[in-house]
Amino acid sequence: MASPLKTFVLRMPATGLVRSSPKASFSTISAARPASCLSRSPFRKQCFKPAISINKSFSRAVSDKPQPETVQATPQPAPSNVLPPLDWNSFFKLRVKRRRYQMLFSITNGIFAGSGGAIFLSTGSAEPIISQIPLDPFMTLGLMTLAFSGLGWLSGPSVGNQVFYILNRQWKKQMTQKEAIFFERIKRNRVDPTNSSANNPVPDFYGEKISSVAGYRSWLKDQKAFNKKKTANFV
């Protein structure tokens, strides 16, 4: 009766056995197989089977679950500093206010300029000029002091205008636009001054006395009355 080892060796094919040592006749270690053999092996799917399997129903439920929508915050518009449009009544009020500024600085500048001129003349710095004028020195000094005051008075409107626009700079652009339109209407509707006379003087040729919309309408009536009176005198 054959031994179990001999029976096992006889049953194994000769190609799958190699010598392990000179003393051992054959070894049970099989030779290395190419990688292509693994692809044909029935155990390939079991060897490379993923360790964790995801249930199909669970994955479908997760995919069908609505994703939370990301709401983008819309930027809030910055508060605009746009001023309301300037109406005509407000324009005339600002115009009257500007005229008061001009008058105030005319008076102030006239007083300060006259005082400064008097102090300057009292030092005797203008004595060579005064001696050449064929008038009484006191009268000459008085006239020169009045000249200094007049220069201060004339500079008042320019200074007052600048101060007014510094304090009301937000209305400067709109006032400039309105003023251009206003003077264009004055120029278009005013009468011809060449036809004026002592009995029929020109009514406010530059529109300086207009201080409201009602005042402008009254100014238009005065222009029409001037033209009617001119026609009546001509006939």
Swiss-Prot record:
Topology relative to the membrane: Multi-pass membrane protein
GO cellular component, one term: PAM complex, Tim23 associated import motor
Record-annotated membrane-spanning stretches: 103-123, 133-153
Protein name: Presequence translocated-associated motor subunit PAM17, mitochondrial
Subunit structure and binding partners: Component of the PAM complex, at least composed of mtHsp70 (SSC1), MGE1, TIM44, PAM16, PAM17 and PAM18.
Gene (UniProt): PAM17
Tagged with keyword Protein transport: yes
Superkingdom of the source species: Eukaryota
Function: Component of the PAM complex, a complex required for the translocation of transit peptide-containing proteins from the inner membrane into the mitochondrial matrix in an ATP-dependent manner.
Chief location: mitochondrion
InterPro entries per record: Pam17
